[in-house]
């Protein structure tokens, strides 16, 4: 099953909604059972939906709320590879980009690059806003 761009956007919005709502199951269910989640080269590495569920807060949730905002999402329907530019807050604030591979409607690979900063998105991108 190949996702359309709209379905990809819905999937990515579901991940962020799960994080924003403190619902680890909602977010983890967007990933395949054998998903790989990495921040290269090895800042973060998680394997599989069960491990991601715990990373996302598990049954007890995170100690402070997560906040995820997508600024841009793009998707190649043929290759089933998508990108998202985001701001994430948990223990610090990060602006970054993630590249994902989709198979059978779920995220199988997640690779993120992020920059920790206290600047808001508008200031962070002020030299090249869009």
Model-derived features with residue positions:
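Short beta-edge strand/loop motif at the mouth of beta-sheet-based domains
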Residues: 43-54
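Small side chains
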Residues: 18, 27, 35, 82-84, ...
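Short hydrophobic/aromatic segments of transmembrane alpha-helices and their interfaces
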Residues: 34-36, 90-91
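A beta-strand edge to alpha-helix "cap/lid" segment located at domain peripheries
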Residues: 2, 53-130
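Short, low-complexity N-terminal intrinsically disordered segments enriched in polar/charged residues
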Residues: 1-33, 127-130
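A short gly/proline-enriched turn/hairpin at secondary-structure junctions
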Residues: 36-45, 61-63
């Amino acid at each position: 099953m190949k996702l359309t761009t709209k379905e990809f956007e819905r999937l990515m919005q579901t991940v962020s909604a799960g994080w924003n709502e403190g619902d680890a199951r909602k977010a983890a269910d967007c990933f395949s059972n054998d998903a790989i989640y990495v921040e290269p080269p090895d800042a973060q590495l998680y394997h599989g939906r069960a491990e991601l569920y715990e990373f996302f807060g598990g049954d007890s949730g995170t100690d402070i709320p997560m906040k995820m905002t997508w600024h841009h999402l793009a998707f190649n329907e043929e290759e089933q590879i998508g990108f998202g530019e985001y701001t994430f807050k948990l223990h610090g604030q990060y602006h970054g980009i993630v590249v994902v591979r989709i198979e059978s409607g779920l995220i199988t690979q997640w690779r993120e690059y992020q920059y920790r900063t206290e600047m808001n998105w508008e200031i962070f991108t002020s030299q090249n806003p869009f």
